[in-house]
């Protein structure tokens, strides 16, 4: 079982510089005796079999640096800050059915729509805000990969990650029934076949924002995320770039070692209420038993959840609640409620990825966390309003900022 207190004690012992590491050894021995060994990262259950060479990394040999040293006079000019996603991108095939067939049965789809999913909408949302955006994950070779590459080209999203030439990118069948249920059947492909060196070629510069989504934490690519997080260190103030992590309620599939490394890196955490409760439970954070009623205690519950979980994480935290807005907490500070923007719920898929993408884009432009959250709230609301086939569509920058201005004007 993951023990957040042991993780923080281990980090404190390492920072103290105890050369004989007696404290570290004692803590680790205690942790091993009290709980089972952390689970290892297991390969993705993929039906795509590699038959050729391994993934070919993109030509970006320089590693991230936190030295802060001035560049030599002959060094090339630094590029603008950009959003870099370590998430996975695949294709969803959405099928509307009356009901799921029984085993061996048959069902006809009323409507079938292929759409790019995973971290794609977050990437698109960042790019539409005018921020340079890059994808560092793996893309394969085949019809699904070609669909993704075309979308990247069309929207000026740069792919800087490995290209796997012996396997196509995977896809998901998403069955939407008339009762509102969603059933997923996944075929994992190149996107899930990463390793510890997957993100070694990512070239980070001051001001960049690295986005990590939960879809890259639960298969073989998780080893690459872990390696990246470990080299990023545990002091966010020493990093010239920011890390934004968006977990989901599927945290039980993230192994203990990776979760500990993520917590110790102290990124900016952003999630909805369900994922926040799941994370708090996994970390052993205290949860106040505040009933959610129409009388207004929802706000109190969200504030308490954000405060308790943020205190446990010792890192910036955003908890989203759709049109109700978001609750933001900085380490050592009070919880701030950022108003949302009411909209009619016509979507079948979450607007959380749009929120995360715009949040990252605004952080890359130098906005504060609260300011970035306000803009992201507006973008998520508009994306629901613009939904196509139940899928939120990221809005353009001008429309988002206009909504933010109208919201600010209405408060005065």
Question: What is each model feature region?
Answer:
Residues 220-228, 256-262, 371:
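A short acidic, amphipathic alpha-helical/loop segment
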Residues 4-7, 11-13, 68, 308, ...:
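Conserved post-catalytic alpha-helical subdomain immediately downstream of the catalytic base
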Residues 2-138, 143-150, 344-345:
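Glycine-rich phosphate/adenosyl-contacting loop at the front of the ribokinase-like
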Residues 99-108, 286-290, 336-339:
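Short glycine/proline- and charge-enriched loop/turn segments
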């Amino acid at each position: 079982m993951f023990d957040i207190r042991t993780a923080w004690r281990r980090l404190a012992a390492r920072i103290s510089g105890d050369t004989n590491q007696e404290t570290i050894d004692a803590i680790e021995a205690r942790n091993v005796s009290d709980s089972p060994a952390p689970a290892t990262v297991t390969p993705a259950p993929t039906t795509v079999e590699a038959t050729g060479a391994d993934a070919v990394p993109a030509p970006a040999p320089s590693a991230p640096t936190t030295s802060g040293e001035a560049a030599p006079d002959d060094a090339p000019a630094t590029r603008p800050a950009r959003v870099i996603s370590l998430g996975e991108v695949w294709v969803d095939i959405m099928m509307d059915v009356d009901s799921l067939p029984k085993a061996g049965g048959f069902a006809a789809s009323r409507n079938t729509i292929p759409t790019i999913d995973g971290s794609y909408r977050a990437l698109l949302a960042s790019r539409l805000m005018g921020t340079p955006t890059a994808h560092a994950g793996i893309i394969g070779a085949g019809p699904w990969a070609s669909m993704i590459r075309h979308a990247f080209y069309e929207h000026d999203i740069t792919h800087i990650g490995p290209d796997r030439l012996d396997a196509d990118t995977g896809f998901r069948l998403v069955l939407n029934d008339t009762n509102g249920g969603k059933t997923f059947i996944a075929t994992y492909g190149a996107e899930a076949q990463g390793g510890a060196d997957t993100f070694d070629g990512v070239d980070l510069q001051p001001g960049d924002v690295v986005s990590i989504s939960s879809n890259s934490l639960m298969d073989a690519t998780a080893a690459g995320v872990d390696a990246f997080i470990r080299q990023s260190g545990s002091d966010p103030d020493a990093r010239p770039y920011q890390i934004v992590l968006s977990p989901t309620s599927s945290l039980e599939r993230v192994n203990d070692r990776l979760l500990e490394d993520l917590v110790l890196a102290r990124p900016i955490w952003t999630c909805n209420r369900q994922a926040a409760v799941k994370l708090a439970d996994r970390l052993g954070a205290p949860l106040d038993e505040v009933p959610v009623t129409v009388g207004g205690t929802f706000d109190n519950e969200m504030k308490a959840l954000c405060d308790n979980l943020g205190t446990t994480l010792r890192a910036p935290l955003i908890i989203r609640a759709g049109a109700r807005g978001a609750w933001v907490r900085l380490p050592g500070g009070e919880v701030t409620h950022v108003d949302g923007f009411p909209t009619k719920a016509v979507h079948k898929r979450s607007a959380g990825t749009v929120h995360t993408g715009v949040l990252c884009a605004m952080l890359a432009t130098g906005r504060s966390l609260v300011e970035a959250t306000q803009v992201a709230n507006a973008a998520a609301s508009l994306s629901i309003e613009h939904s196509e086939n139940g899928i939120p569509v990221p809005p353009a920058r001008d429309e988002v900022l206009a909504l933010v201005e109208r919201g600010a004007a209405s408060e005065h």
